[in-house]
UniProtKB/Swiss-Prot annotation:
The keyword Nucleotide-binding applies. It comes from Dictyostelium discoideum (Social amoeba). Keywords: ER-Golgi transport, Golgi apparatus, GTP-binding, Nucleotide-binding, Protein transport, Transport. This is ADP-ribosylation factor K. It is found in: Golgi apparatus. One of its GO terms (cellular component) is plasma membrane.
Length: 188
């Protein structure tokens, strides 16, 4: 029953946004563990500023027009108890942005487990994945090669994937990541 409610709610919001935009939206699912910086990244893109955020309980949704695409970005909370609800946001997803706290080496196994779980979902079959390696402004941030190795991304053969180092605070790498998403979707 709860599952049906969340599916209906997600469809409702997508349809409402489509009416206002006058065209079909591209649906982007932005997920990652708690504290990775998903909401900070989303609001930086939408508003151009760093906004003080609190942990997302549920979701944030924003429509961003970028590279001739109207992207409805669903930022879903990453706390352990909320991750079970991610599946309710899969339907109709065109791309996944998985935000990683690249300073949190202790949780990379947990990140890998969540990405591996996404890869086996029928509703996400073949859907491209952008890994935004956030918090690159910190001295102890993992580089791209370390992220790729920690998450065993080279084993992914059934879809496009890309790792973009970024810093939500400094705006570094965010637009390059969204360029990759936009170009990949435009070339489908």
């Amino acid at each position: 029953m709860l599952s049906e409610f969340f599916n209906s709610l997600a469809s409702f919001f997508s349809n409402i946004f489509s009416l206002f935009e006058g065209k079909k939206d591209t649906r982007i699912l932005m997920i990652g563990l708690d504290g990775a910086g998903k909401s900070t990244l989303l609001f930086k893109l939408k508003l151009g500023d760093v906004v003080l955020t609190i942990p997302t309980i549920g979701f944030n949704v924003e429509t961003i027009v970028y590279k001739n695409l109207s992207m409805t970005v669903w930022d879903v909370g990453g706390q352990h108890k909320i991750r079970a609800l991610w599946k309710h946001y899969y339907h109709g997803t065109n791309a996944i942005i998985f935000v990683v706290d690249s300073t949190d080496r202790e949780r990379m196994d947990e990140v890998k487990e969540e990405i591996d779980n996404l890869l086996i979902q029928d509703e996400l079959k073949g859907i491209q994945i952008l890994v935004l390696a956030n918090k690159q402004d910190m001295n102890n941030a993992m580089n791209t090669a370390e992220i790729v190795n920690s998450l065993n991304l080279n084993s992914i053969k059934d879809r496009k994937w890309y790792v973009q180092p970024c810093s939500a605070i400094r705006s570094d790498g965010i637009y390059e990541g969204f360029d990759w998403v936009a170009n990949s979707l435009n070339n489908k």
